[in-house]
């Protein structure tokens, strides 16, 4: 039974974008960039979750760079413009930059002429930041000779001009790491759909062990075994006659339908969690008949539902 095609969530960023300057006409230039990539710059207070946001965007397909010097941002933007294989990128700029951070407003205004740039500013209440530094036992970047509270206040003051430029400001005080990743995922979900998770469907024989990279494992040894029918013994589940025999039993059809329904329910949730690939394994005794036929059916159904799926019959080469 083909799966019903279900679209993944496509919630896009709700933050209001500021007007950006229009790039000068350059259509006559032979070296004009062929595409205008998306660049998300993450900044904000130390301990506010910048690393978690960067990782969330990386899981959504963004090319990610942490702590890039401000003076290199224009060059990085130029490289993304000239590289169609990087449709979107994310980078972190923060107080570790030191005095170079003062030039960020001018640099950010400049790159907005060549890329679709967004600035995310993360902050948190003092109590939350103090607690996080206490849990990680790491010093505050501005903590030399200062209490952590004074360091936080100093950082707020230094970053105030950049905060005023932000397209999206997030207070992460009440977020767990998991919740923050979900929050970012919901706002950039337009970049992820069925095609953003690679599904590997595998068949195997239990006599050779369960594939160690399996995320989901289903035992199909309850289905009638074609191995006991002489004309099928040396064939595989890819043979039309063998596949037809296995499919002729009501429990086979019901199993395929129920697993298909389960997967169409699970996959959007895996995508929402940022999972990039999933291995679903089906096992029978030798990995020659039943698991092969079932894996092929499930792969076909997933493909018809719009997912990118590949099938691998691990033990079929061991067929007699």
Swiss-Prot record:
<protein>
    <recommendedName>
        <fullName>Nucleotide-binding protein Acid_7395</fullName>
    </recommendedName>
</protein>
<keyword id="KW-0547">Nucleotide-binding</keyword>
<feature type="binding site">
    <location>
        <begin position="94"/>
        <end position="97"/>
    </location>
    <ligand>
        <name>GTP</name>
    </ligand>
</feature>
<dbReference type="Pfam" id="PF22740">
    <property type="entry name" value="PapZ_C"/>
</dbReference>
<dbReference type="GO" id="GO:0005525">
    <property type="term" value="F:GTP binding"/>
</dbReference>
<dbReference type="Pfam" id="PF03668">
    <property type="entry name" value="RapZ-like_N"/>
</dbReference>
<comment type="function">
    <text>Displays ATPase and GTPase activities.</text>
</comment>
<dbReference type="InterPro" id="IPR053931">
    <property type="entry name" value="RapZ_C"/>
</dbReference>
<feature type="binding site">
    <location>
        <begin position="44"/>
        <end position="51"/>
    </location>
    <ligand>
        <name>ATP</name>
    </ligand>
</feature>
<dbReference type="InterPro" id="IPR053930">
    <property type="entry name" value="RapZ-like_N"/>
</dbReference>
<keyword id="KW-0067">ATP-binding</keyword>
<keyword id="KW-0342">GTP-binding</keyword>
<comment type="similarity">
    <text>Belongs to the RapZ-like family.</text>
</comment>
<dbReference type="InterPro" id="IPR005337">
    <property type="entry name" value="RapZ-like"/>
</dbReference>
<feature type="region of interest" description="Disordered">
    <location>
        <begin position="1"/>
        <end position="34"/>
    </location>
</feature>
<dbReference type="InterPro" id="IPR027417">
    <property type="entry name" value="P-loop_NTPase"/>
</dbReference>
<dbReference type="GO" id="GO:0005524">
    <property type="term" value="F:ATP binding"/>
</dbReference>
